[in-house]
Amino acid sequence: MSPALQKGSSLMENRSPPSSFSIEHILGLDKKTDVASSPIIKHHRPWIECSSKGVVNGTCWQIPVIACDLPIQVHAVHRSEEEETKIRLEKCFGDEDRLTYKRELSWYRGRRPRTAFTRSQIEILENVFRVNSYPGIDVREELASKLALDEDRIQIWFQNRRAKLKRSHRESQFLIVKDSLSSKIQE
């Protein structure tokens, strides 16, 4: 055997025991470690700590239970986020608690309640939009005081109105092109 191979084999024989930082040790997969000598490590596995109802620390978690003797069947269920939230709320809370939780959840997501504009507010905003689709801060603040709204709601309304105008313009351009192409094809 060559000296290099002898050195390599001696290094393999004198290899230190696996580190406690190894992936196998961290995941709890190393079978070689002695249970009595190693300290007990409790891994964070919330799916094991849950009760049968799926409630942990006041939070509702729906945990699928799979029977070992049955083949696993996966069905694609497409629900909207709103439907999923509604189902979870129905399972976890009573009627009066559900509304409170939904409001808190909306606040947590950073959402605010939708602003309902009156007809008169919309008419005034539309009139200003026809004159100037990009009003400055002074105009928006004046509108806010007249309409009893927040200035940021006015700003968002103008952004949404410009997007709506752009979308309708794009759709009308598409229809013009479509009509001209269909007339050329018929000729």
Curated annotation (Swiss-Prot):
InterPro entries: HD, Hesx1, Homeobox_CS, Homeodomain-like_sf. The lineage of its organism: Eukaryota, Metazoa, Chordata, Craniata, Vertebrata. Pfam families: Homeodomain. CDD domains: homeodomain. Gene3D superfamilies: Homeodomain-like. GO terms for biological process: forebrain development; negative regulation of DNA-templated transcription; negative regulation of transcription by RNA polymerase II; pituitary gland development; regulation of neuron differentiation; regulation of transcription by RNA polymerase II; Spemann organizer formation. This is Homeobox expressed in ES cells 1-B. PANTHER family: HOMEOBOX EXPRESSED IN ES CELLS 1. It comes from Xenopus laevis. Residues 110-169 bind DNA. PROSITE patterns: HOMEOBOX_1 (PS00027), HOMEOBOX_2 (PS50071). The keyword Nucleus applies. GO terms for cellular component: nucleus. Keywords: Developmental protein, DNA-binding, Homeobox, Nucleus. It is found in: Nucleus. SUPFAM superfamilies: Homeodomain-like. The N-terminus interacts with the LIM 2 domain of zyx. One of its GO terms (molecular function) is LIM domain binding. The gene is hesx1-b. Its main location: nucleus. First expressed at a low level in the late blastula stage (stage 9) in most cells of the animal half of the embryo. Following this, predominantly expressed in two zones; the dorsal blastopore lip (Spemann organizer) at the beginning of gastrulation, and subsequently in the anterior part of the neural anlage (the region of future forebrain). SMART domains: HOX.
